Amino acid sequence: FELHKGEILGFAGLVGAGRTEVAKCMIGAYRKDGGTVTYKGETLSNSLSRNIEKGIVYLSEDRKDEGLVLMHSVMDNIALPNLKQLAKPFIRKKEMADRAKDYIKSLRIKTHTHLTEARNLSGGNQQKVVIAKWLYSNADVYIFDEPTRGIDVGARDEIYNIMYDLVNQGASIIMISSDLVEVLKMCDRVAVMREGVLEAILDNSPDLTQETILKYAMQGGI
């Protein structure tokens, strides 16, 4: 499949269909059994750190265990993937604090201070911290895995707006979601997986329905 610049490509399917596995193979977190991932004409390696440097980032569905270090501050979590930038020639604490404060303001992260531990934030605000740390890296491709799971309605809309802002600025997004209402609301096209196989890529036209997506997800090619 192809991901276009400024596009949100949805990935739908039943639990266990292989959507997260595809995403982790793309970024180099899982080793591929076959096939290649090409980005800007270059075949990507199986190195997660190198692919992040190239501008491809993954926001895990498990933000508490994979997305955040809960016992560390909001500032530390935002800075962690970006220490290479911040450590030239030494770690610049003031810049870390200033950047964290900027993201707290721009993403409307509800926290007492930038030094508040991530474990003390709500689910929606934790997700915003995860987003902030990758915004800091100026990525081009964002893979959002179940980005609004366990988040209240108000925070969900804020996450959607952040995603819209990203694509309006030229980034591309892959959005893995089990919420078909969300998929139809957000995505330009929908890739449907079943038992590890990509069954279809559907244009999100006014005629596309949840029922059609479910048919592909449950029965395969129609």
Model-predicted segments: where are they?
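Glycine-rich phosphate-binding loops of nucleotide-dependent enzymes
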Residues: 1-222
